[in-house]
């Protein structure tokens, strides 16, 4: 029995030696293996970049859908409760504030306020500062024929096309703030000539307006009975568009 045991022991040592040799040879990099690794890395980067692009497009479409949903028409509410409750509900859902005639400001987090009982009380002021309101969402505010104060400052989706619809509020609107809206240009401000009842207009800090000082002069001529708030036009005429300091003062901000 000693011979078979010795033979098995010798065979085991030879097998392990071959295994170690094979393992040591596998550690040597060949040109073919390097090229394969490069192809694998390039494929990974290509697939990963495609995934990132797809993810960005998905998130963009999701954001667009969210804004569209937030600006949907409140037709059923309007049919049941009328334009005042519809406009108020829309703004409160957006995170803004509303003021009915003879009442205090109502904000989203206020408790103890039921706007359903104010169905026949006109809305006289709306603060939609920073809200996601767009062209479609304005349809919920335009029926507010007694609206006197409207703040749309820092609204990221408000553009020139939106301003072209504000003529429907010309009969009552007296104060309007467009300060800090990034998509409003001179073309949109030209649409405000319909608002002859305006007494105060804030057009400060509009980055899409290339010549703020000159634009303010033209708006003042267009609305002679309105106080137009904006940059110091004398300074803006001397400075280039890239050298103008931002105007952070806004009397309507609170």
Swiss-Prot record:
SUPFAM superfamilies: RNI-like. The modification Phosphoserine is found at residue 250. Its main location: mitochondrion. GO terms for cellular component: mitochondrion; SCF ubiquitin ligase complex. The keyword Mitochondrion applies. Keywords: Mitochondrion, Phosphoprotein. Coiled coil: none annotated. It is found in: Mitochondrion. Interacts with incompletely assembled mitochondrial NADH:ubiquinone oxidoreductase complex (complex I). Required for the assembly of the mitochondrial NADH:ubiquinone oxidoreductase complex (complex I). Involved in the assembly of the distal region of complex I. Belongs to the ATP synthase subunit s family. This is Distal membrane-arm assembly complex protein 2. It comes from Rattus norvegicus.
């Amino acid at each position: 029995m000693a011979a078979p045991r010795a033979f098995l022991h010798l065979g085991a040592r030879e097998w392990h030696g071959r295994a170690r040799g094979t393992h040591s040879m596998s550690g040597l990099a060949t040109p073919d293996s390097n090229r394969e690794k490069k192809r694998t890395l390039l494929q990974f980067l290509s697939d990963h970049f495609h995934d990132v692009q797809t993810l960005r497009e998905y998130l963009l479409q999701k954001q667009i859908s969210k804004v569209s949903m937030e600006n949907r028409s409140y037709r059923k509410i309007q049919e049941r409760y009328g334009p005042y409750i519809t406009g108020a509900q829309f703004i409160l859902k957006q995170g803004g504030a509303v003021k009915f005639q003879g009442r205090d400001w109502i904000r989203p987090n206020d408790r103890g306020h039921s706007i359903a009982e104010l169905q026949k009380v006109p809305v006289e002021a709306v603060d939609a500062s920073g809200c996601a309101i767009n062209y479609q969402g304005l349809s919920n505010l335009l029926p507010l024929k007694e609206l006197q104060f409207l703040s749309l400052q820092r609204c990221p989706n408000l553009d020139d096309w939106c301003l072209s619809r504000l003529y429907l509020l010309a009969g009552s609107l007296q104060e309007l703030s467009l300060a800090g809206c990034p998509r409003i240009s001179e073309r949109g401000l030209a649409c405000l000539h319909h608002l002859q009842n305006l007494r105060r207009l804030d057009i400060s800090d509009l980055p899409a307006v290339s010549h703020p000082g000159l634009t303010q002069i033209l708006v003042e001529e267009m609305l002679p009975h309105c106080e137009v708030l904006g940059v110091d036009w004398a300074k803006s005429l001397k400075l280039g568009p890239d050298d103008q300091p931002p105007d952070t003062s806004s009397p309507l901000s609170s």
